[in-house]
Each structure stands twice: as C-alpha cells, then as structure tokens.
C-alpha cells in the first residue's frame, strides 16, 4: 500500500501563507489506483525524483542499498523487478525463453509473462510484479515521499517445492559420455555452466579444451576438481564451443578464445540441503562429488539399484566422481535404495556415462549418501565475452591455497601496469568463506609499497552470502594512462577464518606450471604494514578488468 506521508504545498501571497496537508484518501492510495489530476501530478513528480536518484529498497526494514539491486517503479507506481532481485531476494526461479516469455516459479506457484509484459530499460529486462505479490509470498509497503519500498515476506520463506526437476523446465543440455578418460570433473563443471543459460540459450562447451588448457599439469587420466574449472573460467581461458574443440581426440587448440566470461560462482559447503535446492532452483545445476563404487562401463554395485536407477553409499571412502545435480524429490521412497537409508528423499543427478546408464543418463542419489553435496559449486553469472576489453591477472591457477594472519580479516593487493589508455571497470576476487564483508580500493598513482597506505580511494564494498568467485563492477570512471602503475586493494572480513586470502601457490605435482614471476602482490593485516606475497612464494588472487579508451 502506498502512503504519501507528507505533501506540503506552500503558496506565498502578500500577507498570507497557505499550507496544504494531504487528504486521508491520498495517504491510503493503492499503487495503480486511479487518482485525480492534481494528485497524479504530484505522484509523477515524486516518481521522476525516485527514477533519478534510485529507489531505497528494503526487506523487512533492512536496506539493500549496498547490493545494487535496481528495482523500479513505472508511471503508475507499480513495481518492476529485474532477474537478479527476483532470484536473490524473492527466491524465484526465473526462466527466460527465446520467444521473450519469462516464467517465474516460487514454491508451487508458476507465473507466465509474455514478451509484451516485460519492460526493457537500459538493456535490462524488468518483470511487473505488483499484481502478483501475494502469489509470490510478499506484502509491500510504499513511502513515495522518501522513495522507499519495503518487502515483507508473508509465507515464512517457504519458497521451495517438494520436488523439482530441471528437465521439466528445459534447463538441461544433452547427456554426454566421458568414455575411459578421467574427465568427469570437466563434464560436471560444463554441464552446470551450460544450464544457467537455459532455456533461453543452449550451448555445448568443450570438455577437451577445459581439460587440456587449464594451466594445471594433469593429463586426461588423472582427474580434476572444481577449483581447476573455476580457475580456467575466471582467467578467460574458456569456455569454448564443443564444435571448435571436439572431445576424445587427444588434441586441443590453445589459441581459441572464450565465448563467454564468468563473473560469479558460489560454493556451498557441508550439504546445507535448503541452500543446495535454492541454488538449483534459482540458478541452475550444481557441480558436486560422491563416491561411486563402480566405474564407466561397469554399472554393477551393491550400492546401486538398477531397477530404480538409485544410488546410496554409506561408507567412509572419499569422493571419486563428479556430476551435476539437477533437481530433487523429498518424497522419493527410501525403499528404492540398496541398502535402504533412514529417510526418504533424493537428489536427481546427471551423469557423464552416456544414456545407457541409469534413466537415460540420470539417476537418484539419497539425501543420506555419505558424500553427495558435501561441497558444491554453482555458476551464477555468465556474460558475453565483450563485457570488458582487458584482464589483468597473475593467478592463472586460481585458488590453490589460503593465507592470513590468524584472524578473520586481512587486506590484499595487486599492482598492475596499464598496457594502453584504459578505464578501470571491475575487479574480481575469491571469498574464502560465507558472509564475507569486503571493501575495494584503488591507488592510481602507485610508486612503491608505501603508496598502498596513503593514496587509496574506496571504489566499492559489499557482502557475499557464500564462499566463491565474485566480480565487483566499478560505477565511477577511473582513467589509466599507458604505462601507468596502479594498485587494486581489497579488505575482507570472513567470520571464522584465520586465513581469508585466496592465493595461487605450490600445490604439488599438479601445480608444476606455477609462475611466481608474473605478479606484484602484497598482503597486510590492517592495511598499514604490508608484506610481499611473492616473497612467501604465492600470488594473490585478485584480477582487474579494463576497457580501452
């Protein structure tokens, strides 16, 4: 409900001042209701002011101003919500189709919006939600004078359905076959990555290219894991299309360039079931691991029920196989498993052993499995490759280890030299744990390590809900001249961590290609006394992105 808390019209005459207060009906207007001409004029002026300075967006009274969600009001004061707000805050599954249709799912509610319903503002799509707030589990209060909107959840946050299958929403790519190679990790990573663009866009990415161009010194038989995939994607090595580098021939083209750029990925630890389901529902398939007591071509195991395509392992072996979780069923009968777990419920998983395995390549894994979803990754933001012109980095191998000062806070910095006249557009880094608060700074006139103290300027801040890889866009223009040295600094506070800085470092044989000569990084506890990262045989995981002038 819209409340106009104070409208004061002051008319100055020769001897009198007349003050006008809003009528009761003006205080209790409903958004979109008809109004008289004078009141409508007042509202339009308020809406114009809000459009210029932005809406103060709150959830249960807490401001979201630091998160950058661009919710808008149309000329009837009805809410227009972008995809990131619908997913992150309202906990909807947002599916966009090639014909322009958008489907919103929340709990058991499914809403369809045609292309004519959607507003496109500054190349961003907005969904009109005012008429559907009750169906989506929210009440909203309005304060147009202050330009404030407060969302109040009224369904207890119960937004997940009891069962969800991405196959039923056109959100999976075809099942593939890894054959005899140890490339399940790459199939799982790319299967998860492919799903986040569906149903709008179907792409099949090259497993060979990821497996053979990731910077790590492992061959196709030695396996891998999600940090390798993340490093490959974050460093713009890929992805590339399968058609340009086909699987299984043992050859690759290292000169291919990425057809998409990864901006964000989140990591969920410790099988937090609601968070796993939420990530699948809102973003797409998740890459995770389990122990498979069978291998490709041999689908016999005491833990696998062929008749029901279900798997449950209750032993102590560590994970040895990666796959993609694409859904769940809370009521999946425990009797379908061999042996029988203590509870109903299963994740729906996409494997990489071809369609002859399971139910055309899919199978059910019990919630009670010893390893499933103990660590999971979901790719949440993928853009076209022209989002930035240039990348500056010294951590091709990405997050190999962590360092810090036995405290949950730290500063870290990287120094770069502009290769041409450019504009700084964004920075990226890893949050090594959930609920990380961060601030981003720049030093544009870097001379030596002392510059990290005196000349830094804050250019961003925020908080991450999950561990993961994050890109922070910079809203102000920071111009760099060719040959100019500049430093990016990030401060983090990661609750419960003693080493909150992600670093590239020696990780054994797989990191034999580690290069510590390509960076100039520094670390500090409070941002006052700095230490060289390279002198500790590490590179700081902190990238910068620029556009050419």
Regions inferred by a protein language model and the residue ranges of each:
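Surface-exposed coil/turn segments at beta-strand junctions on protein surfaces, enriched
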Residues: 120-122, 133, 281, 342, ...
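Extracytoplasmic/surface-exposed domains of secreted proteins
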Residues: 85-86, 131-134, 427, 486-492
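Primary recognition of N-terminal secretory signal peptides and signal-anchoring hydrophobic helices
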Residues: 19-160
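Catalytic-core signature of thiol
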Residues: 21-22, 26, 155-425, 430-466, ...
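Aromatic- and Gly/Pro-enriched, solvent-exposed loop/edge beta-strand patches characteristic
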Residues: 435-516
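Short beta-strand-to-coil "C-cap" segments at the C-terminal boundary of structured domains/repeats
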Residues: 107, 150-155, 381-383, 445, ...
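N-terminal Sec-pathway targeting helices
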Residues: 1-11, 20
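Short, surface-exposed beta-strand/loop patches at domain edges
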Residues: 491-549
């Amino acid at each position: 409900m819209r409340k106009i808390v104070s409208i004061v019209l002051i008319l100055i005459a020769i001897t009198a001042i007349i003050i006008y207060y809003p009528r009761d009906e003006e205080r209790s207007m409903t958004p979109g209701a008809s109004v008289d001409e004078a009141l409508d004029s007042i509202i339009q002026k308020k809406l114009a002011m809000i459009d210029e300075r932005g809406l103060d967006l709150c959830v249960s009274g807490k401001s979201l101003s630091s998160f950058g969600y661009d919710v808008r009001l149309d000329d009837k004061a009805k809410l227009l919500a972008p995809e990131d707000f619908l997913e992150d805050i309202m906990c909807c599954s947002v599916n966009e189709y090639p014909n322009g249709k958008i489907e919103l799912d929340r709990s058991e509610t499914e809403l369809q919006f045609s292309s004519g319903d959607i507003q496109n503002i500054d190349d961003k799509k907005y969904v009109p939600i005012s008429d559907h707030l009750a169906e989506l589990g929210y009440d909203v209060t309005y304060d147009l004078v202050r330009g404030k909107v407060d969302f109040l959840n009224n369904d207890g946050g119960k937004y997940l359905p009891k069962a969800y299958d991405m196959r039923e929403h056109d959100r999976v790519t075809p099942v593939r076959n890894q054959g005899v190679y140890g490339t399940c990790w790459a199939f799982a990573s790319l299967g998860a990555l492919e799903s986040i663009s569906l149903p709008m866009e179907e792409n099949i990415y090259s497993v060979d290219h990821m497996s053979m161009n990731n910077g790590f010194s492992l061959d196709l038989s030695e396996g891998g894991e999600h940090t390798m995939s993340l490093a490959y994607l974050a460093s713009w090595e890929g992805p590339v299309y399968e058609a340009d580098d086909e699987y299984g021939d043992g050859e690759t083209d290292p000169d291919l360039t990425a057809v998409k750029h990864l901006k964000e990925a989140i990591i969920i630890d410790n099988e937090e079931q609601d968070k796993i389901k939420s990530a699948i529902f809102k973003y797409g398939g998740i890459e995770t691991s389990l122990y498979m007591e069978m291998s490709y071509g041999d689908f016999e195991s005491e833990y696998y029920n062929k008749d029901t395509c279900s798997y449950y392992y209750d032993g102590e072996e560590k994970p040895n196989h990666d796959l993609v979780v694409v859904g769940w069923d809370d009521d999946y009968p425990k009797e379908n498993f061999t042996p029988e777990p203590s509870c109903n419920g299963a994740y729906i998983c996409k494997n990489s052993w071809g369609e002859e395995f399971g139910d055309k390549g899919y199978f059910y894994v019990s919630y009670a499995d010893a390893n499933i979803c103990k660590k999971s990754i979901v790719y949440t933001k993928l853009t076209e490759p022209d989002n930035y012109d240039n990348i500056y980095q010294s951590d091709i191998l990405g997050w190999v280890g962590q360092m810090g000062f036995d405290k949950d806070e730290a500063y870290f910095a990287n120094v770069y030299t502009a290769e041409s006249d450019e504009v700084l557009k964004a920075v990226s880094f890893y949050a090594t744990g959930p609920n990380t608060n961060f601030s981003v700074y720049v030093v544009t006139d870097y001379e030596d390590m002392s510059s990290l103290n005196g000349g830094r300027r804050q250019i961003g801040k925020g908080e991450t809900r999950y561990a993961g890889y994050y890109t922070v866009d910079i809203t102000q223009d920071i111009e760099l001249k060719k040959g100019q040295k500049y430093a990016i600094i990030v401060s983090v506070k990661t609750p419960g961590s003693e080493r909150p800085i992600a670093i590239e470092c020696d990780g054994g044989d797989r990191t034999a290609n580690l290069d510590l000569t390509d960076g100039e990084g520094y670390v500090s506890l409070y941002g006052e006394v700095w230490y060289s990262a390279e002198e500790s045989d590490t590179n700081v995981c902190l990238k910068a992105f620029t556009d050419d002038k």
